[in-house]
């Protein structure tokens, strides 16, 4: 995922989270808002409760790989994906299915508005 497709600044994370549009399950909480670009921007956050830095980086890489499989970047949205304590590093397919469910819910909400 290229740099321009990422949300990096703390202030941008806070603005997206404060928009209070979100979907969540036991693995993820995804906050979203529309943006003025022709593409999506994605930020991933993994809390220190999930483990040491090595584990958190691995989790972020896995989530980025899942998003490359599932999400088309042509939708003008900003997403902040917060990985929750229920996430399991070993069970990639279950994590992928849970993420797909949430992204489908978000797409349905956007198309209904």
Feature map (PLM): residue ranges:
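Positively charged, solvent-exposed patches that mediate nucleic-acid binding
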Residues: 1-113
């Amino acid at each position: 995922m290229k740099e321009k497709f990422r949300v990096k600044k703390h202030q941008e994370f806070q603005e997206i989270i404060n928009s209070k549009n979100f979907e969540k399950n036991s693995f993820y909480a995804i906050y979203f808002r529309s943006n003025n670009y022709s593409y999506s921007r994605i930020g991933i956050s993994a809390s220190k409760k999930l483990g040491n830095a090595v584990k958190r980086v691995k989790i972020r890489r896995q989530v980025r790989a899942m998003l490359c499989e599932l999400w088309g970047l042509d939708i003008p949205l900003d997403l902040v994906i917060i990985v929750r304590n229920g996430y399991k590093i070993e069970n990639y397919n279950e994590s992928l299915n849970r993420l797909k469910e949430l992204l489908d819910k978000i797409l349905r909400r956007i198309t209904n508005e």
